[in-house]
Amino acid sequence: MENLSSRLDLLQEQLMNLYEQDSKLIEDQIKQWNLIRQEQVLFHFARKNGVMRIGLQAVPSLASSQEKAKTAIEMVLHLESLKDSPYGTEDWSLQDTSRELFLAPPAGTFKKSGSTLEVTYDNNPDNQTRHTIWNHVYYQNGDDVWRKVSSGVDAVGVYYLEHDGYKNYYVLFAEEASKYSTTGQYAVNYRGKRFTNVMSSTSSPRAAGAPAVHSDYPTLSESDTAQQSTSIDYTELPGQGETSQVRQRQQKTPVRRRPYGRRRSRSPRGGGRREGESTPSRTPGSVPSARDVGSIHTTPQKGHSSRLRRLLQEAWDPPVVCVKGGANQLKCLRYRLKASTQVDFDSISTTWHWTDRKNTERIGSARMLVKFIDEAQREKFLERVALPRSVSVFLGQFNGS
């Protein structure tokens, strides 16, 4: 007990010294998160051995200390990677590297030098929301390379422009209006500029699977005056689908916004078939279509079938898990999975994106595949792995080694 108390005192004293120093070195911020990790590991060990108090300090629950230790590990990984980038020599304060700021919109990025943007709904000055425009946003692309960009605002929302030309929106004004407005009208005020939306047309219901059609959006430019108001004629903004994507004809700039939050199939086999859909017909020796791959959840029968027939049977069933989220979140998850001795899987991919059928534009968030030997191994994986809240999970079948 005395060893635990002295060890805890030493860790907390080192933390207090770092807080008082108010260092701007990224090495000190990494040290701070490593000390937090050690502190939570000590709490976890104490609680697991029945210790409820260390000195005057109550020992948190096992779940709490475990979650905080994992958070500290994640922050260390991000900061060590950032340290090795060209931006590692910049000033980094405790606030710049705090967990709260890291998760603030745009989530999963480091940010500096924010300014406030106000959105007024229904022409009511008492009905407003505020959002932050960041002068510097540090994010990792799909190749795990850190980039430094700035936030921007246009008639659609607040975004940061990635180096490959994508507008990554972290605030969509139409979504905010659906929460806080009764008429759907909003006005945006930023640095003396103001523009508002005017609903002049309505969108007609579209068939399932048909692409949404969006009208052009003017961008708030530096030439706007303090009293100038720009009207926006729009039809529909996405917000409920898997990917919120708006295409601007005027700027020819691809737009995307990453959704956050875990989503997992709850069906026993994870097939994800909607109610009313029929099981695909299957004749002996038939070749499964792209849609049918993974749709039959049975193990191919053993026997004296030809190699071709067995390969065709196996094409229906190989199990995978597709994880979707920010590239840096997936990188951290992949690191944890490969380092873990408690989780079994066959192989894991690097991060990747879907692309548009007509060009090379990336669509939506990054993805990563985890392949398994059989469905039993996948079920154990889903039971044992605590996935971050910032990723979504989909189950499927995939043929290949």
Curated annotation (Swiss-Prot):
Modification after translation: Phosphorylated. Sumoylation plays a regulatory role in E2 transcriptional activity.
Localization annotation: Host nucleus
GO molecular function terms noted in the UniProt entry: DNA binding; DNA-binding transcription factor activity; nucleotide binding
Span list, region Disordered: 199-308
Keyword terms: Activator, DNA replication, DNA-binding, Early protein, Host nucleus, Isopeptide bond, Phosphoprotein, Repressor, Transcription, Transcription regulation, Ubl conjugation
Region (Transactivation domain) location: 1-202
Domain of life from the UniProt record: Viruses
Compositionally biased tracts (Basic residues): 254-267
Chain spans, region DNA-binding domain: 317-401
Function in brief: Plays a role in the initiation of viral DNA replication. A dimer of E2 interacts with a dimer of E1 in order to improve specificity of E1 DNA binding activity. Once the complex recognizes and binds DNA at specific sites, the E2 dimer is removed from DNA. E2 also regulates viral transcription through binding to the E2RE response element (5'-ACCNNNNNNGGT-3') present in multiple copies in the regulatory regions of the viral genome. Activates or represses transcription depending on E2RE's position with regards to proximal promoter elements including the TATA-box.
Name listed for the protein in its UniProt record: Regulatory protein E2
Naturally occurring in which organism (per UniProt): Human papillomavirus type 1 (Human papillomavirus type 1a)
